[in-house]
Amino acid sequence: MPRTPSYTNTKTTQVNNVTEITVFILLGFTDDVDMNIFLFILFLAIYVVTLIGNLGLVVLVIEDSRLHNPMYYFLTVLSSLDACFSSVLTPKMLVNFLSKNKSISFAGCATQMLLFVTFGTTECFLLAAMAYDRYLAIYSPLLYAVRMSPRVYVPLIIASYTGGILHATIHTVATFSLSFCGSNEIRHVFCDIPPLLALSCSDTHLNQLLLFYCAGSIELITILIVLVSYGFVLLAILKINSAEGRRKIFSTCGAHLTGVSIFHGTILFMYVRPSSNYTLEQDMVVSTFYTIVIPMLNPIIYSLRNKDVKEAMRKLLKRKLVHE
C-alpha cells in the first residue's frame, strides 16, 4: 500500500539554515485501520504470553530449591532479559497501532535504541555463557560445582551485561551524532539502527562499517564459544553407553541449541550483511521476530522438554490449588 506523507508532529529546529529533526514518525507495518487493530490484538497476546512465560520461569526457579543451580540461574537471567527486551519495544508499538500520532521524540528514540541493543547484545553473550555452562556440566560433571561456582557464573553474567551496555552505547552515540535534516519518517515499528542510518543526511559509511564489524565480531566470538562448547559436549555424549543418559543430555542441550540457532540466525540476517542487500521492509519483519517473538518462544523452548522444570511447575500449581 502506498503511504501518504505524514506531517503530524513534525517538529524541526533551524540550525545554520539546516532543518534538524527533533521528532520522528514510526510508520509501522501499514496504514490500514483494520490491519492495525488485528496487529494490536496479535502483539498484545504475544506480549502477555511473553511476560507470563518469562516471569513465571523466574518465579519457578526461585520457588523450587531443586532448580537452584547455575544452569537455572542463567535461565532466570535470560528470562528477565527477554521480559525487559519485549517491554522496551512492545508498549510503544501497541500504542502506535491504535493511534494516529505515531511520533517518538529524539531522546525517546535514542533511549529505545540504547535499551534494546543492550538487552539484545547481553543475550548474545549470555547464550555463549550458557553453552560453556553446559560443557562443564556434561564434560566434567565431578568438577562442575567447583568450576561453575558463584565466583565464576556471577562474573560471567556481569560481563554479559557490561558487554551489552558498551556495545549499545557505541552504536547509540554513533547513530545520534549524525544529522537528520530530511524526512522524519522511520520505515519501522521501533528505532532500529539500519532505518535510522537510511534516514540520515550525513555520510553513514563509517556507521555501517561499525555496525558490520562490531555486530560481526560479537557474533563470531559468541558463536565460536557455542560451537567449541558443544563440540566437547558431543565428545562426552559419544563416550556415554546409556541410551537414557544420551537422551537426557540431548533434551537439555537441544533446547539451548534451538534457542541459540533461532536468535543468532536472525541477528546474522539483520546486521552482518553488505549494505547493498538491505531491504528495510524485510528487515522490519525479521527484527520484529527476534525482538518480539523470540522472547515469547524462549520459555517454551527451554521448558517444554525439561523434566525438572515441568515437575517444578506441577508442584507449584498443586501447592497453589491446595492453598485455595
Swiss-Prot record:
Keyword annotations from UniProtKB, A to Z: Cell membrane, Disulfide bond, G-protein coupled receptor, Glycoprotein, Membrane, Olfaction, Receptor, Sensory transduction, Transducer, Transmembrane, Transmembrane helix
Pfam families: 7tm_4
Known glycosylation sites: N17, N101, N277
Molecular function as annotated in GO: G protein-coupled receptor activity; olfactory receptor activity
Places the protein is found: Cell membrane
Extracellular topological intervals: 1-37, 88-111, 167-208, 271-283
Transmembrane segments: 38-58, 67-87, 112-132, 146-166, 209-229, 250-270, 284-304
Record-level GO BP terms: G protein-coupled receptor signaling pathway; sensory perception of smell
Gene3D superfamilies registered for this protein in UniProt: Rhodopsin 7-helix transmembrane proteins
Topological domains, Cytoplasmic: 59-66, 133-145, 230-249, 305-324
Disulfide topology: C109-C201
Superkingdom of origin organism: Eukaryota
Membrane topology qualifier: Multi-pass membrane protein
Cellular compartments per GO CC: membrane; plasma membrane
General function of this protein: Potential odorant receptor.
Family as reported in the entry's similarity comment: Belongs to the G-protein coupled receptor 1 family.
The protein's name: Olfactory receptor 5T17
High-level lineage: Eukaryota, Metazoa, Chordata, Craniata, Vertebrata
